[in-house]
Regions:
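N-terminal low-complexity or amphipathic/hydrophobic leaders
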Residues: 35-96
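Long, positively charged binding patches that form subdomain-scale interaction surfaces
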Residues: 119-181, 189-191
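Boundary at the C-terminal end of the N-terminal hydrophobic targeting segment
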Residues: 22-24
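Bacterial N-terminal signal peptides
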Residues: 8-17
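Bacterial N-terminal signal peptides that target proteins for export
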Residues: 1-9
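Histidine-centered divalent-metal-coordination microenvironment in nucleic-acid enzymes
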Residues: 193-201
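A glycine-rich, hydrophobic loop/mini-helix early in the fold
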Residues: 78-125
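A hydrophobic, small-residue-rich beta->alpha segment in the mid-to-C-terminal subdomain
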Residues: 202-245
Length: 259
């Protein structure tokens, strides 16, 4: 008998510009941003299973119990106090995306850039906008605003409502660390966040969260182009189509300008 929470797997090929040379890379994703936004907070994929598909990524945990950071094959939970903690591989995730990170290009990061300016610089790299990208940004940050949220209990509210009323924001100054980010094309906006989505982990592995705003110091960005996406879909859960407005409300809610 199939388990109650049976999950289907779909392999999605992301469009590739004709004649664009690139090493094939596949990302793995648990569920979709549409499901998460609608309150699909109970997953059946373990952290250990997720790590079979990649060593670099981001997401959350069952009940939206903090922000997930995957770096160098280690998984951390950023809790509402802004602290980061290693996670047991038996824990479950309702939403995550990972890749076996193998950067193909690098870019120097100069000091004084806002999050939007950093994203624009990454977007200017000579790749196809129809593809997915992963970016690892190492360096010092003059300031960085990070957030997390407390674990939810059923009946679950939509994520926009949770973030609006329960997110906790912390501002760090002069901190060394790593941004873990993915960029999805607009055509995949119901699958994952269209545009850039970053989580942060400090160099001492003690602080972290979802990035709302920042001002860069000097650093370096490593970028990987991704041609394919494998998704594990839930067999049941809330149905929803993610609007650009709802995604923006979740991604940058409460962010303050650092310029």
């Amino acid at each position: 008998m199939l388990p109650r929470m049976f999950w289907y797997v779909l392999l999605l090929a992301v469009c590739i510009a004709p004649g664009t040379p690139a090493r094939a890379a596949e990302a793995y994703q648990v569920s979709t941003i549409s499901s998460l936004l609608a309150g699909g907070y109970d997953g059946a994929t373990t952290i250990g299973e997720m790590l079979r598909h990649g060593n670099f990524g981001l997401g959350t945990f069952n009940g939206v119990d903090g922000e997930m950071i995957v770096l160098d094959g280690q998984v951390y939970r950023a809790t509402v106090d802004g602290q980061a903690h290693l996670v047991d591989p038996s824990e479950l995730t309702p939403f995550a995306v990972v890749v076996a990170f193998q950067p193909q290009s690098s870019m120097a990061v100069t000091g004084g850039q806002s999050l939007e300016q950093l994203e624009a610089a990454l977007d200017a790299l000579p790749y196809s906008a129809a593809r997915i990208f992963a970016a690892r940004v190492e360096g010092k940050f003059q300031t960085i605003q990070i957030r997390s949220e407390p674990k939810q209990t059923p009946p679950y509210r939509p994520l926009v409502e949770v973030i609006k009323t329960e997110q906790v924001v912390h501002t760090l100054s002069d901190v060394q660390g790593t941004l873990i980010g993915f960029r999805f094309p607009v055509a995949a906006s119901s699958v994952n966040v269209a545009g850039w989505h970053f989580h942060f982990l400090s160099a001492d592995k003690m602080r972290g969260g979802h990035v709302l705003a920042l001002t860069t110091g000097d650093g370096q960005a490593l970028v990987q182009e991704i041609s394919d996406l494998r998704i594990t879909f839930p067999a049941s859960g809330p149905a929803s189509s993610a609007s650009p407005e709802s995604i923006k409300a979740v991604e940058r809610a409460g962010a303050k300008s650092s310029e």
